[in-house]
Amino acid sequence: MALNDFHVSEPYTLGIELEMQVINPPSYDLSQDSSTLIDAVKPQLTAGEIKHDITESMLEMATGVCRDIDQAAAQLSAMQHVILQAASEHHLGICGGGTHPFQKWQRQEVCDNERYQRTLENFGYLIQQATVFGQHVHVGCANGDDAIYLLHGLSHFVPHFIALSAASPYMQGSDTRFACARLNIFSAFPDNGPMPWVSNWQEFAGLFRRLSYTTMIDSIKDLHWDIRPNPAFGTVEVRVMDTPLTLDHAINMAGLIQATAHWLLTERPFKPQEQDYLLYKFNRFQACRYGLEGVITDAYTGDRRRLADDTLRLLDNVTPSARKLGADSAIDALRLQVKKGGNEAQYMREFIADGGSLIGLVQKHCEIWAGQ
């Protein structure tokens, strides 16, 4: 199957997708009523899109193309208001977090959608297990070769993005001992982790053609790499973040990725090489397991660095780009987060350690998303 030409888009424009949990009080288990909610809110939207994801307990909020994080925040805030109002009318709750802490995957109903039903046929129970919730950020690129360079550059910072956004310590009623357990769900998928090595857009088109021979790949949407190019949108999409508990944190993560993209494409600090990925999965694992306390290893020198320290270095590097893009508030907020030494996974564990229950934790997450 041939790949679409790369659609030229304005560099550094943004798109944000948030996969939200639809909750059923008073049990605070996942609901299976996302279709009802989506039908109720669609006529009220003035910008962005609200749509299904894999199962009936998931709802996706997606912005349109945005110039900067302020425009993205305005669109997401408007969608948030509409969704919360409809959820209240239908006696449902909405919250973030990368996993629901005690849902059972066997109870999850795959959406009655041709693509998702085909995916269920291909992957079986793995699709129901993939009832997890992530944030995806698209960044515009001028051409396909820039997109491939940007993808490789951003891959250096996958552990940093994971550690900052980690919000999935609990699954199936248990503490997983991971800061981000969500990404482990995808380890059984054949397209898990980094994209196979290519050096330019022409090589990527050849890779996609060969992948399509498997009959499991019909479009870019069928590839679940940590970062992927999207020729139809003219973007590179970063997919490793847990859905945050607050809209503010989602915006901050998007601002970091936008600023990092600007720094990478203007400064070109790396010459991408296949060997860059030798320790990719080890460093990714450190971020998932330990969050900002993880230790990453340089594939060339063997140097080992705390993720917290290396994240501060990244934030310093991208600060000039953030100022140009109007994203400096995001960088400042994330810098403060790192210096305080925490992420949302840590907050969740503290809630339980203080005597809270997993049901109470989900209730609290719904209150946080509603601004209570």
From Swiss-Prot:
Gene3D superfamilies named in the record: 3.30.590.20
Biological processes annotated in GO: modified amino acid biosynthetic process
Keyword field: ATP-binding, Ligase, Nucleotide-binding
Recorded superkingdom: Bacteria
GO molecular function, one term: ATP binding
Catalytic activity, as annotated: L-cysteine + L-glutamate + ATP = gamma-L-glutamyl-L-cysteine + ADP + phosphate + H(+)
Enzyme class: ligase
Disulphide-bonded residues: none
HAMAP family in the cross-refs: Glu_cys_ligase_2 (MF_01609)
Protein family according to the UniProt entry: Belongs to the glutamate--cysteine ligase type 2 family. YbdK subfamily.
Subunit comment: Homodimer.
Protein name per UniProt: Putative glutamate--cysteine ligase 2
